[in-house]
Amino acid sequence: MQLSHFLFVAGAIGAAAHPSGHHVHRSAHLKQRDALEFVKTVHTTEAADPPAAAPAPSASPAVLKESAAPAPSPSAPAAPAYTPFCGANAKVKRATLGQILYEGNTGKASGCKWGSNLMVVDNSIADKYDRVMTYTNHDSVPYQVICANKIGPDGAMTPMFPTDGELNFSVAPGQTKTVVADINSQGTCAFAPNEIPKAENGQYAGLWIEFDVGNTSNGGWSGADCSALVAQHYGLPVPTGSVCNFGTTYCSHMLPGGTGDNAYTKGMEAEDGVGLNLNSPKVHLEISMGQY
């Protein structure tokens, strides 16, 4: 998955958008408050000649707000039969800063609840959906998985901070669970053995599986990657895992010890060209937890 430069917002460092001509556009933001907050986004784009980078604004850095942090919701039940996404045909909008803060589909259209664009469904009906993520636990202990949109319910970039509407479920050893996403959804699923640890600022750590599926602003491209940037930034454990294009060896792996193969690890904050780029109307991402 081709990715654009990171953006760092810390103290007096400004924010700038760098649109990418590659398949995926990604940025991260660090801002100074009580502690550094790590925010990372994924945004797909069709392959094209790279446009000129936008100049860094002279104004104050963009403020990335943190959503309220309620207690985690109980394990999300799996829908037993095909369930249409709420507001599936509604239009989406762009948030501020253009491509960097592209909001996409967060499920809120037509009066629907934020996060309704992501659902856990029974494995037997996965083939009824066009954008599927299957999570398989290869370890001997249960794994917690939490999925959420890149843009929070208040319209701010607050990925992987606890919030109402996130998917929160457990996968037992040897078990597979299925998450489906509506078209034009951008977000992250974090996972870890037993319980996902939190960084000192309250953000979920663990191993991140970032996804951008059926991006309607960029010709329907999809992308995904493994990222340990948050966990390694805060010195937290990095689970082993991978995300692959289903039935292929096209993967992003996180190896034991936090070493990446086509994945994001500490020191790669400014790199592009990592992860998966998929140009297909149907996407099936196969996520392995506890092995790569």
Label each residue range with its predicted role.
Residues 159-190:
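Intrinsically disordered, low-complexity Pro/Gly/Ser/Thr-rich segments with frequent PxxP/GP/PP motifs
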Residues 2-130, 194-292:
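Extracellular low-complexity, O-glycosylation-prone Ser/Thr/Pro/Gly-rich "stalks"
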Residues 39-41, 144, 168-170, 176-180, ...:
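Ser/Thr- (and often Asn-) enriched beta-sheet segments in non-cytosolic proteins
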